[in-house]
UniProtKB/Swiss-Prot annotation:
It is found in: Cytoplasm. GO terms for biological process: ribosomal small subunit assembly; translation. GO terms for cellular component: cytosol. Belongs to the RimP family. Required for maturation of 30S ribosomal subunits. HAMAP family: RimP (MF_01077). It comes from the Bacteria. Keywords: Cytoplasm, Ribosome biogenesis. This is Ribosome maturation factor RimP. The keyword Electron transport does not apply. It comes from Staphylococcus aureus (strain JH9). Pfam families: DUF150_C (PF17384), RimP_N (PF02576).
C-alpha cells in the first residue's frame, strides 16, 4: 500500500463509519496523464448511486481540507461490484465457501493464478479448491505469496 493510499484511508475511514458504509478499497493510479483516486464502498444490502454521490461529496470535502495528494486527480467513488477485492482478514473469512481468484507473486504448482472455491483461511495460508481436468484439488497458498485476491464469478 502506498503512502498516499494509507493517508487517504485515515481520512476516509471516519467518514465511512459516520455514513454506516464499509471502506472496501482505496486505489491511487496514474493512467496516461491523469491520476485517479478510486474508492470502493459498500454497506449491508449494497450501495446505490445516491450512496456513492453522498460519499463522494463528503470525501471530496475532507480531501480538499487535508490535501494529501499534491497533483490534480479524479475522484471515483463506486461499489466494489461482484468481483470485489479480498484484502482484510474479515474479507478472507467472509469469502470462505465462495469463488475466488488469486494472483501470486511466484508460481505454485507451475501457476501464478488460481480460480476456485476458498475452503480454509488461517494466519499463514489459504486453501483454494480448484478443478484440474474434471478433478478437484486443494491448493494451499501461503498468504505472503498472494499479490491480489478477489471474489470471482464462476459460470
Amino acid at each position: 500500500m502506498s503512502k498516499i493510499t494509507e493517508q487517504v484511508e485515515v481520512i476516509v475511514q471516519p467518514i465511512m463509519e459516520d455514513l454506516n458504509f464499509e471502506l472496501v478499497d482505496v486505489e491511487y493510479v496514474k493512467e496516461g496523464r491523469d491520476h485517479f483516486l478510486r474508492i470502493s464502498i459498500d454497506k449491508e444490502g449494497g450501495v446505490d448511486l445516491n450512496d456513492c454521490t453522498l460519499a463522494s461529496e463528503k470525501i471530496s470535502e475532507a480531501m480538499d481540507a487535508n490535501d494529501p495528494i499534491p497533483e490534480m486527480y479524479y475522484l471515483d467513488v463506486a461499489s466494489p461490484g461482484a468481483e470485489r477485492p479480498i484484502k482484510k482478514e474479515q474479507d478472507f473469512q467472509n469469502a470462505i465457501t465462495k469463488p475466488v481468484f488469486v494472483s501470486l507473486y511466484v508460481p505454485i504448482e507451475g501457476e501464478k493464478e488460481w480460480l476456485g472455491i476458498l475452503q480454509e483461511v488461517n494466519n499463514e495460508t489459504i486453501v483454494v479448491q480448484v478443478k484440474i481436468k474434471a478433478r478437484t484439488k486443494d491448493i494451499e497458498i501461503p498468504r505472503d505469496k498472494i499479490a491480489k485476491a478477489r471474489h470471482a464469478v464462476m459460470i
